Amino acid sequence: MNGLHILGTGRALPANIVTNDDLALRVETSDEWIVSRTGIRERRFATHETLTQLAVEAARAALERAGVSPQELGLCLTATVSPDCATPSQACLIHQALHLPEDCPAFDLSAGCTGFLYAMETSAALLPRMARPYALLVGGELLSRITDMDDRSTCIIFGDGVGAAVVKADPDAPWFARLGARGCREVLWAPGPGQAEHPYLHMNGQEVFKFALETV
């Protein structure tokens, strides 16, 4: 399979910083407890920013660093489980905001924490067939939208932010990826549109950690 070169990256974060001490005012926890178990000291929670706004900011930074213009892109992929809307796809919203060419396909991948890896593998497979050799890959979440702030097991871990990369197909670049899946909603589950009776994500952190160590 063709490989990829990462030409430029970018990121964008909401302005609102939430510290461990902030969360300790709401749930039974402390800065020391969180840091000792996760290494996390703060996270960002969006108050007014949309995923599209953050994604466009990150994408523009990646394009600038890569020296690639939006009109040179042949593919636009977004990895997310918390898009601004179900349709149009998050990738299409980014496509519109950046005024990408109409022959530049854009679609989302929903694969949780592995989403960006899926996006890289997908772009490596598709780019040789696209009109231009560059792809914009965006990975981002606004997980504060679906996180129960009274659930200590999840609210201390998740936050909001976006990363982006501009990649180029390269048949000579070394490339190896081995993808798989193990679907289990008892371990990790996030709500879909209209699921008001279960509005928050659920995660069995110990099982996810075990799976990551043994398999990922």
Regions found by a protein language model. Give the residues of each.
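Phosphate/pyrophosphate-binding loops at sites that engage ATP/ADP/AMP, CoA/4′-phosphopantetheine
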Residues: A58-G74
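Condensing-enzyme catalytic core mediating Claisen C-C bond formation in acyl metabolism
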Residues: M1-H48, D151-E214
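Acidic, glycine-rich active-site loops and adjacent beta-strand->loop/helix elements
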Residues: A12, A79-D84, A111-T114, G139-S144, ...
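Conserved beta-strand elements of the Class I
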Residues: H5, G74-L77, L136
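Conserved catalytic cysteine-centered active-site region
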Residues: W33-R37, R41-Q53, V81-Y134
